[in-house]
Amino acid sequence: MTTAQSAWGIGLATVTADDQVLDTWYPTGKLGLGELPLVPGEDEADVLDLPPGAVGDRALPGLRTVQLVTVLSSLADPIKDAADAYLRLHLLSHRLVRPNELNLDGIFGKLANVAWTSAGPCPPERVDELRVIERAAGRHLTIYGVDKFPRMTDYVVPSGVRIADADRVRIGAHLASGTTVMHEGFVNFNAGTLGASMVEGRIVQGVVIGDGSDIGGGASIMGTLSGGGTEKVRVGERSLIGANAGVGISLGDDCVVEAGCYITASSKLTLPDGRVVKARELSGVDGLLFWRNSVTGGLEAKPRSGQGIALNAALHAND
């Protein structure tokens, strides 16, 4: 559910000669919700307290860094431009808003496709030109990816989290304190955790994971970016999606999906009383075990007794 809350940010944008914004970085403390907090007589340029050389031309001719101020009257409004999109993504990664609490419709059309390099963002068609410049300076240019979304950690490093492979977490991911993302875990924008969680599988756009839950190695959760689906999946607290398992329905609290078991919304599940239902009828129900009967091969669901899983506290003490 989107919020009508206003927001602001003062940041640095990388801009091409034809005024295309490649990225915008809003430093910690220079963005927030509500009105832009300037005192009378204060100029936006004074707020960032930039060191010499922070703005101006970059090594690649035609590329420059500029300071800009972005003010959003409502996070429910459509995205206006790239600077607007980056502010919304920063608000998520700074944990100022939660996934699905702001309007991100059409974001792909507002972001440029960028080569993310060790020398900063670059138009993909000019990578070789930048490579020559870097080699002339005695540096080797590394290309981290060519995409519309950069790595979150190049812009925001949230407190209290561990991320084993920074390439696996996009800007706009929401990682609550106590979250651990292992090497094979992946977190997309407008997705993430609401409490201490173990992420060894994939959390796709729009999906949120409750406190104390575990997404096992190779596990996946169906999202809305492909296939035409509109329902956003939520995993409750103290739930486990086992290794190489997956879900296309929401899980309530204290649920377990057996390793290797994939439950789509239309999957037929046999209940303990013999009834057969579609999985969507159990979406969001607490205290269930989903598993595949190794004798019949059929998918089954049955109530679980007691509370859900318990994470290893030592793995989530990340401060």
UniProtKB/Swiss-Prot annotation:
Role description: Catalyzes the conversion of the cyclic tetrahydrodipicolinate (THDP) into the acyclic N-succinyl-L-2-amino-6-oxopimelate using succinyl-CoA.
Enzyme class: transferase
One BP term from GO: lysine biosynthetic process via diaminopimelate
EC number: 2.3.1.117
Organism: Salinispora tropica (strain ATCC BAA-916 / DSM 44818 / JCM 13857 / NBRC 105044 / CNB-440)
Protein name as annotated: 2,3,4,5-tetrahydropyridine-2,6-dicarboxylate N-succinyltransferase
Pathway: Amino-acid biosynthesis; L-lysine biosynthesis via DAP pathway; LL-2,6-diaminopimelate from (S)-tetrahydrodipicolinate (succinylase route): step 1/3
Binding site for Mg(2+) 1: D167
Disulfide pattern: none
Keyword set, alphabetical order: Acyltransferase, Amino-acid biosynthesis, Cytoplasm, Diaminopimelate biosynthesis, Lysine biosynthesis, Magnesium, Metal-binding, Transferase
MF term (GO), any: magnesium ion binding
GO cellular component terms listed in the entry, alphabetical order: cytoplasm
Organismal lineage: Bacteria, Bacillati, Actinomycetota, Actinomycetes, Micromonosporales
Compartments in which it is found: Cytoplasm
